[in-house]
Amino acid sequence: GLVECPVPLLGDFDPSFLELPREVLLTSMQEHQKSFGVEDASGNLMPHFLTVLNLHPKDLSLVKKGWERVLRARLEDGRFFWKTDLEATFDEWLEALDAVTFLAPLGSMGEKTRRISALCRWLAAKVQQDPEQAARAGRLSKADLVSAMVGEFDTLQGIMGGIYARKKGETEAVAAALAEQYLPSGPDSPVPGTGLGSILSIADKVDTLVGCFGLGMIPTGAADPYALRRCALGITRIMLERGYRFDVKELFEEAQRLYGDRKWKLAPAEAIAKLNDFFIARVKNYFLTQGKETLLVEAVTAVAPDNVWALGRRLGALESMSRQDDFPQAAQTFKRVANIIRKQGHEAG
């Protein structure tokens, strides 16, 4: 691994730092000091940290004091950022977002949060969520990007948004949604656990997809600088795992409408068509990575592919049928019927 002669070292820090959020403490230890937090039997953090040295020092106590001194400085920074952010308001952060660029042709982060807010409201009506709460979560979704804490620890974006939302009097539903908005962060990452978090995650990803496709920023080969494939996979997983049944093409069109009048590289209809093809390709790929048979995946996505949840249901049903002994004979019968209908259609034409 990382060390040839591992020597564990247990250090301490001032218990007063435990007033900081757990996530801040652990990130300070892990990112800056390559150390681990220490928990008690109940899972609460203790004022200690554990690191691993690469040698047996002559004076272990001196080395310990050095590590503690450096970590203390980092935690002091964290406490300063924490107190600074608690004095700020969401309104101040939202105003500051108007000066933060999302993607140059697509405007500011402030504009993005307004679009996300409107799209969350639209989605809420589709999946029986509170539209006002959904819109509020969308509007606050990127506010923590201009906080002092996220400026120092960018891996805490979203997480700090949720923590600050609770501190500043937002509802628990909104706070949880802010913390979950970047889920799933990878193929093995969980999807959001709440309804508001799910639609916020979808709205954010769809806004990025629609904007990038309108500008012609379509992934090719291994090049995917804006992680659009991951966006599509995340939407797919959320829709399947949460049981959302809305039409994705309709969702894309609504997101495009919210961009208003812009100078796009691709015509709006062309961009939506290309995005829809791209998205269905990612859905197919997801099914294949789950071990589904190629022929079955191709069969279910050949008809009405815009409802991802329905695709999953049809694929499951077809899988069950394919395991039955008479499936080959039934498939051949359907094929003959389809050929007859197709032939009659040509003759009638």
Model-based region annotation:
Residues 1-349:
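Amphipathic alpha-helical "coupling" segments that flank catalytic cores
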